[in-house]
């Protein structure tokens, strides 16, 4: 049985080093190939970007939040938006800092509005992001 992490795996090495184009390619491949934030595999549950988050250095995760915000702002479907929010949250947590990237700060009000319009998991992910930043967003 193959893993969802096999989808787009050729882009992980470049994405973990801060390549925005590779991050977009990874995102597009995973959303098209699976489209959900998690998968229950044979012996474990994995997140859509677990491999990237495991390998990316914290300083690079911080830098890639801006790219993930750009991806998020372009999403029109529930699944795309939800997966983009999950990517943002994963990078935010991996960044190991409570310093809010400026692009995220600027876009967060619009992201919240869109999350509330979709409802459900996107709202929960926004709450997680806010909690990481100690509710300063």
What are these regions (language model features)?
Residues 11, 23, 27, 45-49, ...:
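Generic structural signal of hydrophobic/aromatic residues within well-ordered alpha-helices
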Residues 1-42:
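N-terminal "cap/leader" segments of large eukaryotic alpha-helical scaffolds
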Residues 53-137:
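Extended alpha-helical scaffolding segments
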Residues 4, 8, 30-33, 37, ...:
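Generic alpha-helix detector with strongest preference for long hydrophobic helices that associate
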Residues 2-15, 43-56, 89-96:
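Boundary/linker elements of alpha-helical solenoid repeat scaffolds
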Residues 8, 18, 33-35, 47, ...:
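Residue-identity detector for glycine
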């Amino acid at each position: 049985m193959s893993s969802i992490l096999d989808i787009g795996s050729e882009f992980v090495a470049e994405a973990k080093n801060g390549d925005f184009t590779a991050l977009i390619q990874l995102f597009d491949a995973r959303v098209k190939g699976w489209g959900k934030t998690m998968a229950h595999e044979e012996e474990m549950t994995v997140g859509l970007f677990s491999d990237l988050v495991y390998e990316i250095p914290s300083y690079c995760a911080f830098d890639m939040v801006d790219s993930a915000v750009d991806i998020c702002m372009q999403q029109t479907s529930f699944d795309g938006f939800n997966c983009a929010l999950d990517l943002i949250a994963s990078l935010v947590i991996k960044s190991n800092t409570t310093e809010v990237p400026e692009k995220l700060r600027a876009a967060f009000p619009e992201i919240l509005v869109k999350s509330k319009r979709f409802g459900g998991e996107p709202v929960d992910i926004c709450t997680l992001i806010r909690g990481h930043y100690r509710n300063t967003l």
